[in-house]
Amino acid sequence: MAKRDYYEVLGVGKNASDDEIKKAYRKLAMKFHPDRNPDSKDAEEKFKEAKEAYEMLSDPEKKAAYDQYGHAGVDPNMAGGFGGAQGYGGFAEAFGDIFGDIFGQGGGGRRGGGPQAYRGADLRYSMEISLEQAAHGHEAQIRVPHWDDCDHCHGNGAEPGSSVETCPTCHGAGQVRVSQGFFTMQQTCPKCHGSGKFIPKPCTKCHGQGKLKSQKTLEVKIPAGIDEGMRIRSSGNGEPGINGGPPGDLYVEVHIKPHAVFERDGDDLHCQMPISFATAALGGDLEVPTLSGKATFPVPEATQSGKTFRLRGKGIKGVRSGYPGDLYVHVNVETPVKLTEAQKEMLRQFDRSVHEGGSRHSPQETSWLDKVKSFFS
């Protein structure tokens, strides 16, 4: 049976980053680990397949060979075909096992007298906050998965009245030696799946896992200035490790709700501000909202629609910034609506007055007319 593509096994694209590859492997390893699926041959095969894929794609040299030549590029039996050192990885590990037998130490990979320990998988929690909370900081409580020792078996995985025994196949080592011709290899024990333990009667409540999933409340402190998509790490609050391995971490990913007034651009803020025709023409003081209260700035006379004003220091002080950003106010001149006949007549008189005597009171209109005249001349 032909091997599956390593990227397909992990469920990632060929342009996946090292972090994405690692996350995909951890997710599959926790899902299909033999300790969690003691009676499933299919899960065991998928675990081995994911482990092999990760070992190849997490090694830059092996990954480069695989990307160029496929499975043949990392097959130790075809090492001479491509002239790359990465092709000899399998043989180097085999010789490492031989030297380990002679000198009491391994030449590559994991060696040791106990079962393999695995770090727990990381967890991700998505949280949505307001722009004000992002700017000023926020404290929140979240509910996340938690694993407690099983109260039925007290965490050892065995049904009360029975006991956990040392694996009779690997004698507690978690690994067994397998001879292949002149070479001696180590592989995960097929009976205990690397735990070094054997449970004749698994706990009926936790099914031999020793832990039960529950929920717990965590306090999360969101720093002032946090931006969209940033993550906060809570060490040790991920899934528990396997065989004594350390727990994973919890990552709280922050998303910011759209704001009714402001749009954020890094540490800067932008807002659209409507102003009257009279204010734009005559000038005046304009009061605008900010995240820290109201601010006033002067609007000069003859201000055109679309003009942008910059208020320094009225933006957000980012988590990595030493000073706050700016607030950009984009003014839009509003055309008056629902006018009375008297008001309309006043505007007609005003319009006639500004066009009398050749005075140029509308710079954009005049510029446009000049362009049209030159076009037809």
UniProtKB/Swiss-Prot annotation:
Binds 2 Zn(2+) ions per monomer. It is found in: Cytoplasm. Zn(2+) 1 binds at residues 150, 153, 203, 206. Its cofactor is Zn(2+). Residues 5-70 form the J domain. GO terms for biological process: chaperone cofactor-dependent protein refolding; DNA replication; protein refolding; response to heat. A zinc finger (CR-type) spans 137-215. InterPro entries: DnaJ (IPR012724), DnaJ_C (IPR002939), DnaJ_domain (IPR001623), DnaJ_domain_CS (IPR018253), HSP40/DnaJ_pept-bd (IPR008971), HSP_DnaJ_Cys-rich_dom (IPR001305), HSP_DnaJ_Cys-rich_dom_sf (IPR036410), J_dom_sf (IPR036869). Zn(2+) 2 binds at residues 167, 170, 189, 192. Keywords: Chaperone, Cytoplasm, DNA replication, Metal-binding, Repeat, Stress response, Zinc, Zinc-finger. GO terms for molecular function: ATP binding; heat shock protein binding; unfolded protein binding; zinc ion binding. PROSITE patterns: DNAJ_1, DNAJ_2, ZF_CR. GO terms for cellular component: cytoplasm. CXXCXGXG motif repeats lie at residues 150-157, 167-174, 189-196, 203-210. It holds the Pfam family DnaJ_CXXCXGXG. Its main location: cytoplasm. The J domain is necessary and sufficient to stimulate DnaK ATPase activity. Zinc center 1 plays an important role in the autonomous, DnaK-independent chaperone activity of DnaJ. Zinc center 2 is essential for interaction with DnaK and for DnaJ activity. Belongs to the DnaJ family. Homodimer. Participates actively in the response to hyperosmotic and heat shock by preventing the aggregation of stress-denatured proteins and by disaggregating proteins, also in an autonomous, DnaK-independent fashion. Unfolded proteins bind initially to DnaJ; upon interaction with the DnaJ-bound protein, DnaK hydrolyzes its bound ATP, resulting in the formation of a stable complex. GrpE releases ADP from DnaK; ATP binding to DnaK triggers the release of the substrate protein, thus completing the reaction cycle. This is Chaperone protein DnaJ. It comes from Cupriavidus taiwanensis (strain DSM 17343 / BCRC 17206 / CCUG 44338 / CIP 107171 / LMG 19424 / R1). The gene is dnaJ.
